[in-house]
């Protein structure tokens, strides 16, 4: 847990994990086979907790009789993608994001924004990432609690796109962690968008995945 970084979402983890674990066990008991959607912060670690706890037997051992990984999905990236698009419309330096950019990772400090996949600029991408991450703090400085934008962009709108089988931003299971990326739900399972990622962008994504993996 990276509480020392000041990321409020990580400070929420222990409390929300207990609640997530409770409902994960209920899903196990009901042999639930639908989607288990997580919208509470921090989304990605909580998704992992849901998957783990649903597969834990009453004796504490893992028996893998609970949810499948493809059933668990987190919704936190949509609002960060929307915030990046907002700043891209305001600042011509970031305009390429609107047609060529992508958002990855968690809803928080380890967010990864790429200004463009085709013409990736690491410095610009990091600046746009910082703008999106700090948007919450700017709203709070103005005296508002930012909850409407996440409820729409990460919640309602992304959930509807997901249920319709359309492309959207959400967190899915990937190499042992839940990671936000553009994907869609097909009858055959989850389809992640496959892109030729620049090496610098791959390195940023690996750092984020390693940090997510370290959260217990």
List the predicted regions and their residue ranges.
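Short amphipathic alpha-helical segments, especially helix-boundary/capping motifs
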Residues: 23-27, 62-63, 129-136
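Short, charged/polar micro-motifs that form catalytic or ligand-binding hotspots
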Residues: 13, 36, 40, 146
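Rossmann-like dinucleotide-binding core of oxidoreductases
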Residues: 35-115
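Conserved active-site and cofactor/substrate-binding residues in soluble primary-metabolism enzymes
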Residues: 14-18, 22, 45, 151-158, ...
């Amino acid at each position: 847990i990276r509480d020392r970084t000041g990321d409020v979402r990580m400070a929420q983890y222990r409390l929300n994990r207990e609640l997530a674990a409770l409902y994960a066990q209920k899903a196990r008991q009901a042999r639930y086979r639908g989607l288990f959607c997580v919208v509470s912060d921090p989304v990605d670690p909580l998704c992992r907790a849901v998957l783990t706890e649903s597969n834990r037997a009453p004796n504490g051992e893992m028996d893998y009789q609970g949810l499948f990984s493809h059933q668990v999905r987190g919704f936190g990236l949509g609002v960060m993608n929307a915030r990046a698009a907002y700043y891209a419309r305001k600042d011509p330096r970031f305009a390429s994001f609107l047609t060529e950019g992508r958002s990855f990772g968690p809803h928080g400090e380890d967010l990864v924004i790429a200004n463009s996949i085709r013409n990736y600029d690491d410095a610009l991408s990091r600046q746009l990432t910082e703008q999106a991450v700090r948007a919450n703090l700017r709203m709070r400085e103005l005296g508002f609690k930012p909850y409407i934008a996440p409820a729409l962009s990460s919640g309602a709108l992304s959930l509807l796109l997901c249920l319709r089988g359309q492309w959207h931003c959400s967190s899915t299971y990937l190499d042992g962690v839940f990671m936000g990326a553009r994907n869609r739900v097909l009858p055959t399972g989850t389809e992640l968008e496959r892109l030729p990622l620049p090496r610098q962008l791959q390195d940023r994504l690996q750092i984020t995945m390693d940090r997510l993996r370290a959260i217990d």
